[in-house]
Amino acid sequence: MVRALSELGLSDDVKASMTKYKSNNWDLYFDRSRSIYKAQKKDDNDDDLMYFMSPGESTNQLYADYTNKTRVLKKNLMGDDYLLKDTIPKINWKIMHDIRIISGYECRKAIGRINDTVYVVAFYTDEILLRGGPEGFSGLPGMILGLAIPRLNTTWFATKVEAFTNFNNEIQPPTKGKRAETDRELKKLIELFTRYNGNKNEKPEEILKTIYGFVL
């Protein structure tokens, strides 16, 4: 844990604050054009494709189709599972010169920004061609193996990468959950979310950003 945090080049203050949080394992299964990101089952053996460590626990899932640039997010909101479809968000990245080794791969640093003001630090490898990564982050010339959002005191990093041949059944969009696709369904979801969280003064588009936010 300490070694991986130092690899990401985080400040001592950020690393100290991260130690207060609980970490857990996530799996990222992927092929040449698709991926699915989900919390690792507690009874899984240590032979999964890719692990990411991140604070908190979750049973949510994120499926991404990079050919069609679409994704399906299964997210538990107010005690119910919802299926949320949208396009893969575009992030403008600035590629830096810094190099780090993560899980045996040479990774280059990149800096991006989400929600206008939140900076993201990523480390990607061009040895894995899929332009994906944990939490749906994508758009770099290879797989993201390290990710940090200093403002949120949150970090993800790959601890193991392995190749398998028979796992296509794992890379499927989630199907169990309440659908929220039409304008009417989304409006109803926003109203429920507003009542549940008390965000009466927040604009609907900002609430949707929260709903479609992190998979965690």
Question: Could you say what each language-model-derived stretch is?
Answer:
Residues 1-216:
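Extended soluble regions of mature proteins
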